[in-house]
Protein backbone atom coordinates (compact mmCIF):
# COMPACT_ATOMS: atom_id res chain seq x y z
CA UNK A 1 0.00 0.00 0.00
CA UNK A 2 1.19 3.52 -0.76
CA UNK A 3 2.56 5.05 2.47
CA UNK A 4 2.15 8.54 1.05
CA UNK A 5 -1.37 8.57 2.53
CA UNK A 6 -1.79 8.08 6.26
CA UNK A 7 -5.50 7.43 6.14
CA UNK A 8 -6.97 5.54 3.19
CA UNK A 9 -10.47 6.89 3.76
CA UNK A 10 -9.71 10.61 4.02
CA UNK A 11 -6.57 10.64 1.88
CA UNK A 12 -4.77 13.05 4.22
CA UNK A 13 -1.13 13.60 3.33
CA UNK A 14 1.70 13.63 5.85
CA UNK A 15 2.63 17.19 6.64
CA UNK A 16 6.21 18.28 6.34
CA UNK A 17 7.47 21.31 8.25
CA UNK A 18 8.93 24.09 6.17
CA UNK A 19 12.52 25.31 6.70
CA UNK A 20 13.47 28.85 5.78
CA UNK A 21 16.50 31.09 6.22
CA UNK A 22 15.90 34.41 7.96
CA UNK A 23 18.88 36.64 7.15
CA UNK A 24 21.81 37.23 7.02
CA UNK A 25 20.82 40.01 4.62
CA UNK A 26 17.35 40.58 6.03
CA UNK A 27 16.66 44.19 7.12
CA UNK A 28 15.11 43.02 10.41
CA UNK A 29 18.05 40.74 11.23
CA UNK A 30 20.07 43.65 12.71
CA UNK A 31 23.39 42.86 11.13
CA UNK A 32 24.58 39.45 10.05
CA UNK A 33 22.16 37.23 11.97
CA UNK A 34 21.17 34.03 10.22
CA UNK A 35 18.24 32.13 11.66
CA UNK A 36 17.14 28.77 10.33
CA UNK A 37 13.42 28.67 11.04
CA UNK A 38 11.31 25.53 11.00
CA UNK A 39 7.73 26.53 10.34
CA UNK A 40 4.49 24.66 10.73
CA UNK A 41 2.33 26.84 8.52
CA UNK A 42 3.19 30.22 10.00
CA UNK A 43 4.03 29.02 13.51
CA UNK A 44 7.69 28.76 14.49
CA UNK A 45 8.60 25.24 15.62
CA UNK A 46 12.36 25.80 15.86
CA UNK A 47 14.54 28.87 15.60
CA UNK A 48 18.21 28.07 15.17
CA UNK A 49 20.65 31.02 15.23
CA UNK A 50 23.81 30.66 13.15
CA UNK A 51 26.42 33.11 14.35
CA UNK A 52 30.06 33.78 13.55
CA UNK A 53 29.69 35.72 10.29
CA UNK A 54 31.35 38.74 11.93
CA UNK A 55 33.89 36.82 14.01
CA UNK A 56 37.26 38.60 14.02
CA UNK A 57 39.00 36.79 16.85
CA UNK A 58 39.10 39.89 19.05
CA UNK A 59 39.95 38.05 22.26
CA UNK A 60 42.91 36.29 20.61
CA UNK A 61 44.15 39.46 18.92
CA UNK A 62 44.14 41.23 22.28
CA UNK A 63 46.79 38.85 23.61
CA UNK A 64 49.33 40.21 21.10
CA UNK A 65 48.72 43.93 21.72
CA UNK A 66 49.58 46.23 24.61
CA UNK A 67 46.84 47.31 27.01
CA UNK A 68 46.48 50.71 25.37
CA UNK A 69 46.45 49.27 21.83
CA UNK A 70 43.61 46.97 22.89
CA UNK A 71 41.31 49.85 23.82
CA UNK A 72 40.05 50.57 20.26
CA UNK A 73 38.93 46.93 19.87
CA UNK A 74 36.16 47.69 22.35
CA UNK A 75 34.68 50.39 20.12
CA UNK A 76 34.20 47.73 17.49
CA UNK A 77 32.18 45.37 19.66
CA UNK A 78 28.85 47.09 20.27
CA UNK A 79 29.37 49.79 17.67
CA UNK A 80 26.03 51.44 18.49
CA UNK A 81 27.30 52.80 21.83
CA UNK A 82 31.09 52.42 21.71
CA UNK A 83 32.24 54.29 24.83
CA UNK A 84 30.34 52.02 27.24
CA UNK A 85 32.56 49.10 26.24
CA UNK A 86 35.80 51.07 26.62
CA UNK A 87 34.61 51.86 30.14
CA UNK A 88 34.71 48.20 31.22
CA UNK A 89 38.24 47.73 29.86
CA UNK A 90 39.52 50.85 31.63
CA UNK A 91 37.88 49.81 34.92
CA UNK A 92 39.53 46.38 34.73
CA UNK A 93 43.00 47.90 34.20
CA UNK A 94 42.45 50.51 36.93
CA UNK A 95 41.44 47.85 39.45
CA UNK A 96 44.57 45.81 38.79
CA UNK A 97 46.93 48.81 38.78
CA UNK A 98 45.18 50.62 41.66
CA UNK A 99 44.96 53.92 39.77
CA UNK A 100 42.60 56.58 41.14
CA UNK A 101 40.66 58.36 38.39
CA UNK A 102 40.39 62.16 38.83
CA UNK A 103 36.90 63.31 39.71
CA UNK A 104 36.40 65.41 36.59
CA UNK A 105 37.36 62.44 34.39
CA UNK A 106 34.93 60.26 36.32
CA UNK A 107 32.09 62.72 35.64
CA UNK A 108 32.97 62.92 31.94
CA UNK A 109 32.89 59.11 31.77
CA UNK A 110 29.43 58.99 33.32
CA UNK A 111 28.25 61.75 30.97
CA UNK A 112 29.41 59.92 27.85
CA UNK A 113 28.21 56.53 29.10
CA UNK A 114 24.73 57.99 29.41
CA UNK A 115 24.97 59.64 25.99
CA UNK A 116 25.88 56.15 24.71
CA UNK A 117 22.80 54.72 26.42
CA UNK A 118 20.56 57.25 24.70
CA UNK A 119 22.30 56.55 21.36
CA UNK A 120 21.61 52.84 21.77
CA UNK A 121 18.01 53.08 22.93
CA UNK A 122 17.11 55.62 20.23
CA UNK A 123 18.37 53.23 17.58
CA UNK A 124 16.73 50.21 19.17
CA UNK A 125 13.29 51.67 19.86
CA UNK A 126 12.99 53.29 16.43
CA UNK A 127 14.32 50.40 14.33
CA UNK A 128 12.23 47.92 16.30
CA UNK A 129 9.22 50.08 15.43
CA UNK A 130 10.32 49.90 11.80
CA UNK A 131 10.54 46.10 12.03
CA UNK A 132 6.86 45.98 12.99
CA UNK A 133 5.81 48.46 10.33
CA UNK A 134 6.16 52.06 11.64
CA UNK A 135 8.38 54.02 9.26
CA UNK A 136 8.43 57.49 10.85
CA UNK A 137 10.28 56.83 14.18
CA UNK A 138 13.67 55.86 12.64
CA UNK A 139 13.78 59.14 10.75
CA UNK A 140 13.20 61.11 13.96
CA UNK A 141 15.51 58.90 16.00
CA UNK A 142 18.43 59.23 13.60
CA UNK A 143 18.07 63.00 13.59
CA UNK A 144 18.66 62.99 17.37
CA UNK A 145 21.44 60.41 17.14
CA UNK A 146 23.20 62.69 14.68
CA UNK A 147 23.38 65.45 17.31
CA UNK A 148 24.85 63.01 19.84
CA UNK A 149 27.37 61.75 17.30
CA UNK A 150 28.55 65.33 16.93
CA UNK A 151 29.08 65.48 20.72
CA UNK A 152 31.18 62.30 20.42
CA UNK A 153 33.17 63.93 17.64
CA UNK A 154 33.73 67.16 19.54
CA UNK A 155 35.05 65.26 22.56
CA UNK A 156 37.24 62.66 20.86
CA UNK A 157 37.58 63.59 17.18
CA UNK A 158 35.66 60.53 15.98
CA UNK A 159 31.93 60.01 15.52
CA UNK A 160 31.92 56.29 16.10
CA UNK A 161 35.19 54.64 17.13
CA UNK A 162 36.08 57.19 19.75
CA UNK A 163 38.87 55.57 21.85
CA UNK A 164 38.17 58.41 24.28
CA UNK A 165 38.20 56.63 27.65
CA UNK A 166 41.74 55.81 28.76
CA UNK A 167 43.08 53.82 31.71
CA UNK A 168 43.38 56.59 34.32
CA UNK A 169 40.75 58.96 32.93
CA UNK A 170 39.76 60.31 29.51
CA UNK A 171 41.93 61.48 26.63
CA UNK A 172 41.15 65.19 26.75
CA UNK A 173 38.98 67.70 28.56
CA UNK A 174 35.62 68.99 27.33
CA UNK A 175 35.39 72.61 26.26
CA UNK A 176 32.95 74.91 28.12
CA UNK A 177 31.14 75.47 24.82
CA UNK A 178 30.56 71.73 24.36
CA UNK A 179 29.15 71.46 27.89
CA UNK A 180 26.71 74.29 27.08
CA UNK A 181 25.64 72.59 23.84
CA UNK A 182 25.01 69.24 25.56
CA UNK A 183 22.98 71.10 28.20
CA UNK A 184 20.88 72.74 25.49
CA UNK A 185 20.30 69.35 23.85
CA UNK A 186 19.30 67.75 27.18
CA UNK A 187 16.68 70.46 27.71
CA UNK A 188 14.83 69.82 24.47
CA UNK A 189 15.34 66.03 24.20
CA UNK A 190 12.38 65.05 26.47
CA UNK A 191 10.12 66.78 23.92
CA UNK A 192 11.47 64.43 21.21
CA UNK A 193 10.74 61.46 23.49
CA UNK A 194 7.19 62.75 23.98
CA UNK A 195 6.77 62.86 20.19
CA UNK A 196 8.01 59.26 19.89
CA UNK A 197 5.70 58.32 22.76
CA UNK A 198 2.78 59.84 20.91
CA UNK A 199 3.60 57.84 17.79
CA UNK A 200 4.10 54.45 19.39
CA UNK A 201 3.04 53.92 23.00
CA UNK A 202 -0.73 53.90 22.54
CA UNK A 203 -0.64 52.99 18.86
CA UNK A 204 -3.07 50.12 18.36
CA UNK A 205 -1.02 48.30 15.72
CA UNK A 206 2.24 48.72 17.65
CA UNK A 207 0.58 47.25 20.73
CA UNK A 208 -0.89 44.32 18.82
CA UNK A 209 2.56 43.50 17.47
CA UNK A 210 4.35 43.71 20.85
CA UNK A 211 2.03 42.95 23.78
CA UNK A 212 2.38 39.35 25.02
CA UNK A 213 5.08 38.62 22.44
CA UNK A 214 8.38 37.14 23.63
CA UNK A 215 7.42 36.87 27.30
CA UNK A 216 10.36 36.25 29.65
CA UNK A 217 9.79 35.16 33.26
CA UNK A 218 12.07 35.66 36.27
CA UNK A 219 13.03 31.98 36.14
CA UNK A 220 14.04 32.31 32.47
CA UNK A 221 16.24 35.28 33.36
CA UNK A 222 18.16 33.27 35.95
CA UNK A 223 18.35 30.17 33.75
CA UNK A 224 19.66 31.94 30.66
CA UNK A 225 21.80 34.66 32.28
CA UNK A 226 19.98 37.70 30.95
CA UNK A 227 20.86 41.24 32.00
CA UNK A 228 19.89 44.84 31.31
CA UNK A 229 16.46 45.65 29.90
CA UNK A 230 15.69 41.94 29.43
CA UNK A 231 15.77 41.63 33.25
CA UNK A 232 14.08 44.91 34.11
CA UNK A 233 11.27 44.36 31.62
CA UNK A 234 10.22 41.32 33.66
CA UNK A 235 10.05 43.09 37.01
CA UNK A 236 13.53 42.59 38.47
CA UNK A 237 15.12 45.92 39.42
CA UNK A 238 18.68 44.84 38.64
CA UNK A 239 20.92 47.62 37.34
CA UNK A 240 24.67 47.61 38.02
CA UNK A 241 24.68 51.40 38.34
CA UNK A 242 22.53 50.99 41.43
CA UNK A 243 23.25 47.46 42.70
CA UNK A 244 27.06 47.49 42.26
CA UNK A 245 27.89 51.17 41.74
CA UNK A 246 31.04 51.94 39.77
CA UNK A 247 32.61 55.29 38.82
CA UNK A 248 30.52 57.92 40.66
CA UNK A 249 27.00 56.66 39.89
CA UNK A 250 26.15 56.49 43.60
CA UNK A 251 26.08 60.33 43.69
CA UNK A 252 23.36 60.65 41.07
CA UNK A 253 19.63 60.77 41.55
CA UNK A 254 17.88 58.54 39.02
CA UNK A 255 15.28 55.81 38.96
CA UNK A 256 15.38 52.28 37.55
CA UNK A 257 12.38 51.69 35.24
CA UNK A 258 10.91 48.21 35.69
CA UNK A 259 8.28 46.40 33.63
CA UNK A 260 5.65 43.94 34.76
CA UNK A 261 4.85 41.44 32.01
CA UNK A 262 8.28 40.77 30.50
CA UNK A 263 7.03 41.08 26.93
CA UNK A 264 8.31 43.11 23.98
CA UNK A 265 6.04 46.03 24.87
CA UNK A 266 7.33 46.29 28.45
CA UNK A 267 10.91 46.23 27.21
CA UNK A 268 10.06 49.06 24.83
CA UNK A 269 8.55 51.08 27.71
CA UNK A 270 11.64 50.44 29.86
CA UNK A 271 13.93 51.74 27.13
CA UNK A 272 11.81 54.86 26.65
CA UNK A 273 11.90 55.63 30.38
CA UNK A 274 15.62 54.84 30.59
CA UNK A 275 16.28 57.56 28.02
CA UNK A 276 14.46 60.02 30.28
CA UNK A 277 16.48 58.90 33.29
CA UNK A 278 19.72 59.13 31.30
CA UNK A 279 18.82 62.70 30.39
CA UNK A 280 18.43 63.44 34.11
CA UNK A 281 21.87 61.97 34.82
CA UNK A 282 23.35 63.99 31.94
CA UNK A 283 21.91 67.21 33.37
CA UNK A 284 23.25 66.43 36.87
CA UNK A 285 26.64 65.60 35.35
CA UNK A 286 26.84 68.90 33.51
CA UNK A 287 25.98 70.83 36.68
CA UNK A 288 28.81 69.05 38.53
CA UNK A 289 31.27 69.56 35.67
CA UNK A 290 30.75 73.34 35.85
CA UNK A 291 31.97 73.28 39.46
CA UNK A 292 34.54 70.48 39.29
CA UNK A 293 37.79 71.64 37.71
CA UNK A 294 41.05 69.74 37.45
CA UNK A 295 42.97 67.23 35.36
CA UNK A 296 41.21 64.51 33.37
CA UNK A 297 44.03 61.94 33.56
CA UNK A 298 45.69 60.40 36.61
CA UNK A 299 49.26 61.41 35.78
CA UNK A 300 51.58 58.50 36.40
CA UNK A 301 53.03 55.40 34.81
CA UNK A 302 49.98 54.39 32.79
CA UNK A 303 49.16 57.83 31.31
CA UNK A 304 51.18 60.18 29.10
CA UNK A 305 52.75 63.34 30.57
CA UNK A 306 51.24 66.75 29.71
CA UNK A 307 52.38 68.20 26.35
CA UNK A 308 53.94 71.27 27.96
CA UNK A 309 56.07 69.10 30.22
CA UNK A 310 57.39 67.09 27.28
CA UNK A 311 58.78 70.26 25.71
CA UNK A 312 61.01 70.95 28.72
CA UNK A 313 61.65 67.65 30.52
CA UNK A 314 63.75 64.84 29.05
CA UNK A 315 62.23 62.35 31.55
CA UNK A 316 58.73 63.23 30.34
CA UNK A 317 59.79 62.67 26.73
CA UNK A 318 61.31 59.27 27.56
CA UNK A 319 58.19 58.32 29.52
CA UNK A 320 55.99 59.28 26.56
CA UNK A 321 58.13 57.26 24.14
CA UNK A 322 58.19 54.17 26.36
CA UNK A 323 54.46 54.39 27.04
CA UNK A 324 53.51 54.34 23.37
CA UNK A 325 56.10 51.79 22.22
CA UNK A 326 56.38 49.28 25.03
CA UNK A 327 53.20 50.20 26.91
CA UNK A 328 52.69 50.01 30.66
CA UNK A 329 53.00 46.84 32.74
CA UNK A 330 50.01 45.62 34.74
CA UNK A 331 50.67 43.65 37.96
CA UNK A 332 49.90 39.92 37.75
CA UNK A 333 46.38 39.06 38.84
CA UNK A 334 42.86 38.60 37.58
CA UNK A 335 39.84 40.84 37.78
CA UNK A 336 36.27 41.01 36.49
CA UNK A 337 34.97 44.49 35.71
CA UNK A 338 31.40 44.97 34.54
CA UNK A 339 29.42 48.01 33.48
CA UNK A 340 25.71 48.47 32.85
CA UNK A 341 25.99 48.87 29.08
CA UNK A 342 22.80 49.82 27.19
CA UNK A 343 22.22 46.19 26.17
CA UNK A 344 22.94 44.65 29.58
CA UNK A 345 25.90 43.69 31.73
CA UNK A 346 29.04 44.10 29.65
CA UNK A 347 31.96 42.54 31.48
CA UNK A 348 35.68 42.03 30.98
CA UNK A 349 37.48 39.21 32.76
CA UNK A 350 41.12 40.17 32.57
CA UNK A 351 44.04 37.91 33.50
CA UNK A 352 47.35 39.78 33.70
CA UNK A 353 50.76 38.13 34.00
CA UNK A 354 52.82 41.19 34.90
CA UNK A 355 53.84 42.01 31.32
CA UNK A 356 52.71 44.80 28.99
CA UNK A 357 50.13 42.54 27.31
CA UNK A 358 47.07 40.79 28.75
CA UNK A 359 47.53 37.04 29.23
CA UNK A 360 43.82 36.54 28.53
CA UNK A 361 40.81 38.79 28.25
CA UNK A 362 37.34 37.29 28.20
CA UNK A 363 34.59 39.59 26.99
CA UNK A 364 31.09 39.02 28.34
CA UNK A 365 28.75 40.44 25.73
CA UNK A 366 25.14 40.74 26.91
CA UNK A 367 23.72 40.20 23.40
CA UNK A 368 25.38 36.77 23.17
CA UNK A 369 23.46 35.49 26.19
CA UNK A 370 20.21 37.01 24.95
CA UNK A 371 20.50 35.52 21.48
CA UNK A 372 21.15 32.00 22.82
CA UNK A 373 17.57 32.00 24.13
CA UNK A 374 15.96 32.98 20.81
CA UNK A 375 14.79 29.41 20.15
CA UNK A 376 13.22 29.21 23.60
CA UNK A 377 11.53 32.62 23.32
CA UNK A 378 10.36 32.42 19.69
CA UNK A 379 8.95 28.89 19.76
CA UNK A 380 5.19 28.91 19.26
CA UNK A 381 5.08 32.47 17.93
CA UNK A 382 4.24 33.44 14.37
CA UNK A 383 6.90 34.15 11.77
CA UNK A 384 6.09 37.87 11.85
CA UNK A 385 6.73 37.96 15.61
CA UNK A 386 10.33 36.77 15.22
CA UNK A 387 11.48 40.17 13.98
CA UNK A 388 9.66 41.90 16.87
CA UNK A 389 11.45 39.58 19.34
CA UNK A 390 14.89 40.12 17.77
CA UNK A 391 14.25 43.86 17.95
CA UNK A 392 13.67 43.88 21.71
CA UNK A 393 16.49 41.41 22.45
CA UNK A 394 18.68 44.26 21.14
CA UNK A 395 21.38 42.27 19.36
CA UNK A 396 24.42 43.77 17.66
CA UNK A 397 26.80 41.39 15.97
CA UNK A 398 30.03 43.17 16.73
CA UNK A 399 29.76 42.02 20.34
CA UNK A 400 28.05 38.68 19.72
CA UNK A 401 30.59 37.36 17.22
CA UNK A 402 33.55 39.30 18.67
UniProtKB/Swiss-Prot annotation:
Keywords: Cell inner membrane, Cell membrane, Membrane, NAD, Quinone, Translocase, Transport, Ubiquinone. The keyword Cytoplasm does not apply. InterPro entries: NADH_Q_OxRdtase_suD, NADH_UbQ_OxRdtase_49kDa_CS, NDH1_su_D/H, NiFe-Hase_large. It is a peripheral membrane protein. Pfam families: Complex1_49kDa (PF00346). It is an enzyme of class 7 (translocase). One of its GO terms (molecular function) is quinone binding. It catalyses: a quinone + NADH + 5 H(+)(in) = a quinol + NAD(+) + 4 H(+)(out). Gene3D superfamilies: Cytochrome-c3 Hydrogenase, chain B. It is found in: Cell inner membrane. One of its GO terms (cellular component) is plasma membrane. Its EC number is 7.1.1.-. NCBIfam families: NuoD, PRK06075.1. NDH-1 shuttles electrons from NADH, via FMN and iron-sulfur (Fe-S) centers, to quinones in the respiratory chain. The immediate electron acceptor for the enzyme in this species is believed to be ubiquinone. Couples the redox reaction to proton translocation (for every two electrons transferred, four hydrogen ions are translocated across the cytoplasmic membrane), and thus conserves the redox energy in a proton gradient. Belongs to the complex I 49 kDa subunit family. NDH-1 is composed of 14 different subunits. Subunits NuoB, C, D, E, F, and G constitute the peripheral sector of the complex. This is NADH-quinone oxidoreductase subunit D. It comes from Cereibacter sphaeroides (strain ATCC 17025 / ATH 2.4.3). The gene is nuoD.
Amino acid sequence: MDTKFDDVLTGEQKLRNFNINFGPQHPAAHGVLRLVLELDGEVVERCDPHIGLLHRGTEKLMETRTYLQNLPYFDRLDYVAPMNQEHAWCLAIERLTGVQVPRRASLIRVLYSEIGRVLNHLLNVTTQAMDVGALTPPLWGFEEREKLMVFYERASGARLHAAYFRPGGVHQDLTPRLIEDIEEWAEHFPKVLDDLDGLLTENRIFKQRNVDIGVVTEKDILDWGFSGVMVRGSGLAWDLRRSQPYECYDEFDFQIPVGKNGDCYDRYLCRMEEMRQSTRIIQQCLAKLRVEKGDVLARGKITPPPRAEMKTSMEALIHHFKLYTEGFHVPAGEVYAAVEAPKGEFGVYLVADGTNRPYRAKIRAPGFLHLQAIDYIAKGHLLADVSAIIGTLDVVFGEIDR
